[in-house]
Amino acid sequence: MPRLTWCAVVLVAGCAAIACKDDGEQTLPPSPPPTAAQNPCPASSAASAVIGDAASPSRSKNSGRVVHGDPRGMLGDVLWRHRAGASLRTASAGVTSRATEDVGEIAVIQDEGDVVTPANTFDLQLSGLRYTPRTGGGYDVSRTDASFRAALGDAVTLGDDDSVSRNVPFTFNFYGRPQTLAWVNSDGNITFGVRDTAITSRDISRLLTGAPRVAVFFGDLDPSAGGRVFVRSAADAFTATWCGVRVFDSPRQVTVQASFFPDGTIEMKYAGAPALTAVDGIAAVSPGSTDTFLPVDLSTSATRTISGGAGAIGEQFSLRPDLDLVALSRKFYRTHADRYDQLVVWTDEVMTPEDTFSFEVTVANDIAGIGLDRFDASGEFGSNDLSSLVQMDAISKFPDDPATKFLGENNTLSVIGQEVGHRWLAFLHFSDHNRQNSEALLGRDLAHWSFFFNSDASVMEGNRIEDLGGGTFRTTAAVERYSLLDQYAMGLVRDIDVPSMFYVESPTGLPANTAADSAPRVGVTFSGTRRDLLINDVIEIMGARQPSSADSPRVFRQAFVFVVGRGRTAAPAAVAKIDRIRRAWEPFFLRAVDNRARVETRLNPGT
């Protein structure tokens, strides 16, 4: 939840400064030595793909995916990356006079080494890591040889976002808790207590707030696309090996091995290219449900032991630079009034992860009844009024004409509509026909409408669905507007203004790979059982929206911000393109909400 995640990250800095040191530690005996050559994975298990560039950022779990994971979990990750990135950034001495300037209604902000964190490329190929328990709790990290253990054990069948459990034949003491059952997950990690088959972002927030985890390479891996996973559960060691496992929708692959031993130590082994070519992932251990994370440079373990603490410890790797939204927001507010509800941010290079097109992060919420906790982290971003930031990413990713369809059923304006809409949507559960709490309206990441929900062509996904009779349905439109249910969550209409709705249960006769979390698609005919619901069914589970529509704003203030990379200047054509989008966005939003509200995108609104 946002409040929990924010508080967790606030504590990270304190952990790094004072809580992650134990001078009374006692080094335990080394774990049993590996007994194999570097990479014992059978050649037949390797993914049959050439090494090359990763898939287009518009691709992910479904073609046409627009955002990165559940925006409810983004806040903690953004705040953590701000703190961790400070050690990687090198800000210029002083601030130049052109660091921030307005070009018309676009705020141009120059990176001076203060808002963009350089890429942290994966550098553990042909290496081994040993995590040694500390007497005060947690783990220290040191280097060990890169040889994999020869006995791989049994091959297990894992699909995408899948998991298999195995008993541990000894009591493994992990962060002070005995573990005798391990879940080997397809995404390059082992969890204790529960499996992890979620499709949400493989980020630091999930590492911290999820289950206790040994993450040898925590990334979006898909064994069904290539490679094999092996598990050996023996008295001397529990070992899981990912042999040539493909990264989702990418030619990249991962060959890694994680082992843990009766004495409590953990070893992680990494192959070299071409067996290991993935770039975005996390190498770490975490006790789960923790408030602390110590980000470290694991490559330095070759020359020293890295002292950890009672919380998680590890490193996140990314091929691309990272835009620090916290630092950016603070820099923006140093030269602009605190009058904005949202910042809509564009960049002159790609800065989102490989599986991300654009995303939104909610930084404050005072609304009940929409599926979000009430919390306020706006102060972290240098504001009292900011509620949300949207990272649209590189302007070059978007067509010159904002109305041109280019991302599934989406055009640029509907993409903005979805990202802006994540401030309120889509998180609604309801009481179903059995009077049970249901999330059947929800699709991807439980933060978008289901493909099978008649969402009236909402920009928050789903489709407009025509009931053809006889249990047959057809999708007729998509990503055109905010439905009346959307507008209820946004505070623009009363509950009594929301008409009866329906979704289709147990759908059949679908095109291949079509599921609830699929991107909208017009012209799909399928069969199923119609289920009707009313807004009162939503309120029964979520509670009434507070404040009501009578007390909710009708004007949303947004600033369009263009971040220019260090040493570069803002290209006039790029600024003009962003302004063209900005001017088209205002009337699009007005139509999308049936003239019930407007966005104001001028800088210095109200003046």
Regions found by a protein language model. Give the residues of each.
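C-terminal motif of bacterial Sec signal peptides marking the signal peptidase cleavage site
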Residues: 16-19
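Bacterial signal peptide processing site
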Residues: 21-23
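Intrinsically disordered, low-complexity proline-rich regions
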Residues: 27-35
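Extracytoplasmic Ser/Thr/Pro-rich, glycosylation-prone low-complexity segments
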Residues: 39-328, 485, 542-607
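Zn2+-dependent metallopeptidase catalytic core
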Residues: 169, 178, 314-420, 515-606
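Short linear, low-complexity motifs centered on an aromatic residue
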Residues: 253-257, 481, 495-528
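The catalytic-center signature of Zn2+-dependent metalloproteases
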Residues: 409-492
